[in-house]
Amino acid sequence: GVPSFDDKLVQEVVRMVLEAIYEGHFEDTSHGFRPHRSCHTALNAVQKTFTGKKWFIEGDIKGFFDNVNHDILIDILKERISDERSIRLIRKFLKAGYLEQWQFHGTYSGMPQGGIISPILANIYLDKLDKYMKEYASKFDKGDRGRQQREYEVLTYQKRLVMRELKTATNN
């Protein structure tokens, strides 16, 4: 269902508080649903910092918002938020449920897509994955940069040959 004005107002205040608590602790590589960040800032970061790594991780967590485990999310929140009333309030938002054809449906997992606090809660939940992957990746990032692919080396060599031929042809 559509939240009332009062619910939206309370959610916005909770979102602002959560952002103040967590925003400075998210990984710099995280760009989704964050202030002053977008897919464009993510692409710019890749363009500026790419060093020929050996591997990438790309993912799309299908049905993410529908499948967030409430208990795990609450446990993550409790690591930084000790106020039990705040935790209860967030749990109430998660468990609010919805009305469909005048019948109430409880919510036992997931977050409402389009909910005011859903994006920040998603980032809090996925920050654990970001930190794990950063630590995991560091085990593979040895040396200055990864070895470039053979195809890239061949293309680079061919480009140099063509450039040399062009210089020779224009100088004659």
Listing of model-derived features with the role each one plays in the protein:
Residues 1-172:
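Non-catalytic terminal/accessory segments
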